[in-house]
Swiss-Prot record:
One of its GO terms (biological process) is base-excision repair, AP site formation via deaminated base removal. Signal peptide: none annotated. Gene3D superfamilies: Uracil-DNA glycosylase-like domain. Excises uracil residues from the DNA which can arise as a result of misincorporation of dUMP residues by DNA polymerase or due to deamination of cytosine. Its main location: cytoplasm. Keywords: Cytoplasm, DNA damage, DNA repair, Hydrolase. It is found in: Cytoplasm. One of its GO terms (molecular function) is uracil DNA N-glycosylase activity. PANTHER family: URACIL-DNA GLYCOSYLASE. The keyword DNA damage applies. PROSITE patterns: U_DNA_GLYCOSYLASE (PS00130). It holds the Pfam family UDG. The gene is ung2. This is Uracil-DNA glycosylase 2.
């Protein structure tokens, strides 16, 4: 039984008994037994564990976890301490520096954002080592769509940051006029120069939150 330790337990309890999820669970059992899979089994739901639904102010949507050793720990774009900062996150830090003058930290550990109400959610929560998108289409997308739908129902305003085509597909789930979404290309080096750099999503997010009487996010990640 999955224990998230906050309001997500009640909000998702029916979901974890759905046939698609039970099938996904069997698939994951086999994958973890026979393959190298990231993140660690106990880190799969960290995004939900760190950020309760009632606390969500911002959602940053990723695709699937990093597939290199020691990187993924259940939060989109974040890596564990002591691991080299991946290129997409380097570009996020660069945009933060240009937008809000944040210093570029020496690590990619984004727990500080999660603690402030930034839900760092991948649309697929597991991946085989070295094989991007290897767990796509197994059922994770149904669950993460449901999570987005639940957040969409919140009364308090939420900002959705949707970077890249995969993330932009989720716009159709956002029907609540209280929320807003900012979209751009993905921060990957392949696309960042085509509209991510200079998007000012971080200052725009804080502006929206403040206009709605919500405490803004301190985006500065401390160096370790």
């Amino acid at each position: 039984m999955i224990k998230l330790g906050n309001d997500w337990d009640e909000l998702l309890k029916d979901e974890f008994n759905q046939p698609y999820y039970l099938t996904l669970r069997q698939f994951l059992k086999k994958e973890y037994q026979t393959k190298k899979v990231f993140p660690d089994m106990y880190d799969i739901f960290n995004a939900l564990k760190y950020t309760a639904c009632k606390d969500v102010k911002v959602v940053i949507l990723g695709q699937d976890p990093y597939h290199g050793p020691g990187q993924a720990h259940g939060l989109s774009f974040s890596v564990q301490q002591g691991v080299q900062i991946p290129p997409s996150l380097q570009n996020i830090y660069l945009e933060l520096h240009n937008d809000l003058n944040c210093e570029i930290p020496n690590n990619g550990y984004l727990i500080r954002w999660a603690d402030q109400g930034v839900l760092l959610l991948n649309t697929v929560l597991t991946v085989r080592a070295g094989q991007a998108n290897s767990h796509r289409g197994q059922g994770w997308e149904i669950l993460t769509n449901r999570i987005i739908e639940i957040i969409n129902q919140k009364e308090e305003p939420v900002v959705f940051l949707l970077w890249g085509n995969n993330a932009k597909e989720k716009l159709q789930l956002l029907t609540n006029p209280k929320h807003t979404a900012f979209t751009s290309v993905h921060p990957s080096p392949l696309s960042a120069s085509r509209g991510f750099m200079g998007c000012k999503h971080f200052s725009k997010t804080n502006q929206f939150l403040e206009q709605n009487g919500v405490k803004p996010i301190d985006w500065q990640i401390p160096s370790i």
